[in-house]
Regions:
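Interhelical loop/hinge segments that connect adjacent transmembrane helices in multipass membrane
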Residues: 1-7, 11, 181, 197-237, ...
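C-terminal transmembrane helix end/exit motif
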Residues: 2, 70, 141-148, 152, ...
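Alpha-helical transmembrane segments of multi-pass membrane proteins
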Residues: 103, 107, 118-141, 156-160, ...
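Helix-terminus/linker motif at the lipid-water interface of multi-pass membrane proteins
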Residues: 29-44, 113-116, 234-265, 280-283, ...
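N-terminal membrane topogenesis motif
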Residues: 1-30, 82-88, 122, 153, ...
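Hydrophobic alpha-helical transmembrane segments
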Residues: 123, 127, 156-204, 222
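Specific pore-lining/lateral-gate transmembrane helices of multi-pass inner-membrane transport
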Residues: 75-92, 255-345
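Signature of the first transmembrane helix
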Residues: 9-68, 98-106, 166-167, 224-250, ...
Length: 345
């Protein structure tokens, strides 16, 4: 087999494994959608879909570009001690900043919840979102470490543990106990804690409590300029919920979000490809046949993506609204949200 073929095979294998990991992670969205739709009103479901975009934006702030800087300097580095030094600087920096940012969020809880949710009763559980941010901030780098050393199976095991706990607790807290939004956030806290514990071997293996200011400056010099672009991209991708709330109401946010989550099937494929692509691209960029390999991979990606778009656009509305013994995945109350599926795809 040629080196180009071997590289494509490696990329395809990693994409498949990362795809499984992201399918596990994103599958909870689809598996829990009928539960949320049947157990939560559009107003409450709308509140959930305003809180999660806020979490996504804040995750960027919690990382402030160190994730991009880490991959830039860690992956090409061959010396193990140097790699541990890079990991230590990144994790210690995030550890301190996470404590500071989380404390600031708790102090600003009242105005933030009022700005995001208005007078909605969900403001009473808004502080739970800050705990999720803290745990995700502490677990992000260990998970990224396994991506950076191209250990997709380890990555999938971490995501699988998180998803199983999250799914089980959602069924218990929301489905059986009827805790609604509080149950969703409580399940997320528990699953984020499990993710941190399962990923913690990467911390113990690499963290040595040494500090190198020069490495830290290099990481920030590379990573910080990426933050505005990432934030603006996320605002474009997630800001629609806030515009809908502003021009309409929170119930409309919930109805729209039901269709949006179906459209996120395409994001499963794109995210799986992107997760495998970054380490693969950096490790292959200095090879002679890199351009040919990249061209073939991207062509295949476009073909598969076009097929997924057509399949989901045509089949999602009739299948998801189909009546199964008086039940449907998307109930009539939320059916109007399916109009957005092709646009989201």
């Amino acid at each position: 087999m040629s080196s180009v073929g071997a590289n494509i095979k490696k990329m395809a294998g990693n994409t498949l494994v990362y795809g499984l990991g992201n399918i596990f992670n994103r599958a909870i969205t689809f598996l829990l959608l009928p539960l949320y739709i049947n157990m939560m009103t559009p107003v409450e479901f709308g509140a959930l879909n305003l809180i999660y975009p806020f979490l996504a934006l804040m995750n960027v702030v919690y990382m402030y570009g160190l994730d991009a800087g880490f991959m830039r300097f860690f992956i090409p580095e061959k010396d193990q001690k140097r790699r541990q030094e890079i990991f230590s600087v990144v994790y210690l920096s995030i550890l301190v900043s996470t404590a500071i940012i989380t404390a600031a969020l708790f102090l600003a809880e009242a105005p933030l919840s009022s700005l995001l949710l208005g007078d909605d009763p969900a403001t009473s559980v808004f502080a739970l979102a800050f705990i999720i941010l803290m745990l995700d901030g502490l677990s992000f780098m260990p998970v990224l470490y396994y991506r950076s050393i191209q250990k997709p199976l380890r990555y999938v095991s971490i995501i699988f543990s998180e998803v199983v706990i999250n799914l089980g607790l959602n069924v218990l807290l929301v489905g059986f106990w009827g805790w609604g939004l509080k149950g969703v956030l409580g399940a997320n806290i528990s699953s984020s804690l499990i993710k941190l514990l399962v990923a913690s071997p990467a911390i113990f293996k690499n963290l040595n409590f040494t500090w190198n200011t020069r490495i830290w400056k290099d990481l920030l010099k590379f990573g910080l300029p990426t933050v505005p672009a990432v934030l603006f991209a996320m605002v474009v991708a997630l800001g629609d919920r806030f515009l809908i709330k502003y021009f309409f109401d929170q119930a409309t946010v919930g109805i729209y979000s039901a269709g949006y989550k179906i459209g996120m099937i395409m994001a499963l494929m794109v995210t799986a490809f992107r997760f495998a692509w970054h380490p693969f691209f950096l490790s292959l960029s200095d090879q002679e046949n890199a351009r040919e390999t990249f061209a073939k991979i991207l062509t295949l990606f476009v073909i598969v993506g076009s097929f997924v778009f057509l399949l989901v656009s045509l089949l999602a509305p009739p299948v998801l609204t189909m009546d199964f013994n008086g039940k449907a995945i998307i109930t009539p109350e939320y059916a109007d949200g399916l109009r957005s599926v092709p646009l989201i795809l």
